[in-house]
């Protein structure tokens, strides 16, 4: 709904992969940015093994559930599995495998949260990862192609977690 070229910067953090066409959404964001402005986008990164992640195996079911029912399911599941995953996710090397295959968010590496805060965060983020109608991770090449198509140049990747690209509108 915005006019073209009205903002000095446009950004999206973890949203575009939840649209019906993430690549198209990424290529249209630059339209609202003035020449010389910046566009920054963060999305889930798709790697060859991404779709083997436990969440993608159950999402075909969970994304069809009513939110209230899914939240109950998540609360029950997290209540049962949280104490176990608190241990499994901490095992050197194997912890990463468990975190990848068990569709429960991993907060074991968040030292500033106590047990209850981690539990609540796991419930919230597990619901968040299982509920969206769309979840389309992108490769670096796909996101960069979308930005270039939208008129963005000097695209570079930022070192933070996830796929974070930033560039300048020409």
Region locations from a protein language model:
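A short glycine-rich, Lys/Arg-flanked "PGG" loop and its adjoining helix->strand segment in the class I
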Residues: 23-38
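A short acidic, Gly/Pro-enriched loop at the edge of an enzyme's catalytic core
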Residues: 1-9
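C-terminal lobe and adjacent flexible extensions of AdoMet/dcAdoMet transferase-like proteins
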Residues: 110-170
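Short, glycine-/aromatic-enriched active-site segment of Class I SAM-dependent methyltransferases
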Residues: 11, 44, 48-61, 115-133
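Conserved class I S-adenosyl-L-methionine
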Residues: 38-85, 99, 103
